[in-house]
UniProtKB/Swiss-Prot annotation:
Biological pathway: Pyrimidine metabolism; dTTP biosynthesis
Class of the enzyme per the UniProt entry, highest EC level: transferase
InterPro entries per the UniProt record, alphabetical: Thymidate_synth/dCMP_Mease, Thymidate_synth/dCMP_Mease_dom, Thymidate_synth/dCMP_Mease_sf, Thymidylate_synthase, Thymidylate_synthase_AS
Protein's recorded name: Thymidylate synthase
A single MF term (Gene Ontology): thymidylate synthase activity
Reaction(s) catalysed (UniProt annotation): dUMP + (6R)-5,10-methylene-5,6,7,8-tetrahydrofolate = 7,8-dihydrofolate + dTMP
Catalytic center residues: 146
Residues spanning the signal sequence: none
Quaternary structure and partners: Homodimer.
């Protein structure tokens, strides 16, 4: 996870001090890219322990088109609790846009199903793009999409993914985002009969909150450990049929977790 640690170090040393929506204050840089070879191990941060259950269940929740936190709460995942209303609803966030994007004519579009079909039909397409940034529905969202657009690319029978993330909470959010989109790439590859290539992570405003500086410095004192490996149930070939038990991470031996407050 050298690219991630380099980002952490760079922002601590050279980031610009900025105010932000939450009132916490940040140190940030604009425009940063990381690349992870998905054949060299699963890109899961080892310099602190991540909550795998949250990463996996959140992605499955997105893929089902769900926007209510009931499923997450039922599976002991609390990462969206602060933004949900009294009924557990978040408005038309990621799952809605991925699976039921509403066009100007009111017709809903299943972007993810289209993506799987198009990769099979035309793997050389330059239009293998999914967007969660539906301008007409942004005001209704509890939180506007941070990881807003991603694109797939096929060459030599391998599927790569590039994510554009407009806003990245480097200490808490970005490690989750790396793992989530790496997992998604593996799942889409299996559903389309492909191997995996790279995950490319492009960040717009990459920031550390001011109350995460000490935690980031502590993390940088730790020596990275070998990356784990991802194991998917080979019998699942429908992207939307994956369940939690179909996904396993082997050999994850991280340093202890480092607690940090969430900026809401």
């Amino acid at each position: 996870m050298k690219p991630y640690l380099e980002l952490l170090q760079h922002v601590l040393e050279y980031g610009a001090e900025k105010s932000d929506r939450t009132g916490t204050g940040t140190r940030s840089v604009f425009g940063w890219q990381m690349r992870f070879d998905l054949n060299a191990g699963f890109p899961l941060v080892t310099t602190k322990k991540l909550h795998l259950r949250s990463i996996i269940h959140e992605l499955l929740w997105f893929l089902q088109g769900d926007t209510n936190i009931a499923y997450l709460k039922d599976n002991q995942v609390r990462i969206w609790d602060e933004w949900a209303d009294a009924n557990g609803d978040l408005g038309p966030v990621y799952g809605k846009q991925w699976r039921r994007w509403t066009g100007p004519d009111g017709v809903e579009i299943d972007q993810m199903q289209w993506l799987v079909d198009e990769i099979k039909r035309n793997p050389d397409s330059r239009r293998l793009v999914i967007s969660a940034w539906n301008v007409g529905e942004l005001p209704q969202m509890a939180l506007m999409p941070c990881h807003s657009l991603f694109q797939f690319y096929v060459v030599d029978g391998k599927l790569s993914c590039q994510l554009y993330q407009r806003s990245g909470d480097i200490f808490l959010g970005v490690p989750f985002n790396i793992a989530s989109y790496a997992l998604l790439t593996h799942m889409v590859a299996q559903a389309t009969g492909l191997g995996v290539g790279d995950f490319v992570h492009t960040l717009g405003d990459a920031h550390l909150y001011s109350n995460h500086f000490e935690q980031a410095r502590e993390q940088l004192t730790r020596t990275p450990r070998p990356l784990p490996t991802l194991r998917l149930n080979p019998d699942v070939t429908d992207l939307f049929a994956f369940r939690f038990e179909d996904i396993a991470i082997d050999g994850y031996d991280p340093h202890p977790a480092i607690k940090a407050p969430v900026a809401v």
